[in-house]
């Protein structure tokens, strides 16, 4: 999860520098890893607890929901939300 968060941040920063939409698409693709678009097709984010599983293993997901993984998931989500809010404000600006 930590690496996924780093990739989301890096992709959004690449968009901020280049303006190329492909970087936003890549950030969303990275975030979707938490939601089951991963090698095991298993969801790591648990909406009931608000936590995130600690990672993928050969035989499934690590059921622990550590603070580091949860923060990685939630901060990735906030990064995308902020990006979309910033873009909405830019479009609304005179």
Task: Describe each model-derived feature in a short phrase.
Residues 1-94:
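Glycan-recognition and catalytic cores of secretory/periplasmic carbohydrate-active enzymes
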């Amino acid at each position: 999860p930590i690496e996924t968060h780093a990739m989301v941040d890096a992709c959004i920063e690449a968009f901020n520098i280049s303006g190329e939409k492909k970087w936003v698409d890549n950030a969303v693709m990275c975030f979707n890893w938490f939601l089951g678009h991963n090698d095991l097709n298993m969801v790591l984010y648990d909406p009931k607890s608000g936590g995130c599983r600690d990672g993928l293993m050969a035989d499934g997901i690590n059921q622990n929901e550590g603070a580091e993984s949860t923060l990685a998931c939630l901060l990735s989500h906030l990064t995308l939300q902020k990006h979309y809010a910033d873009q909405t404000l830019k479009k609304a600006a005179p």
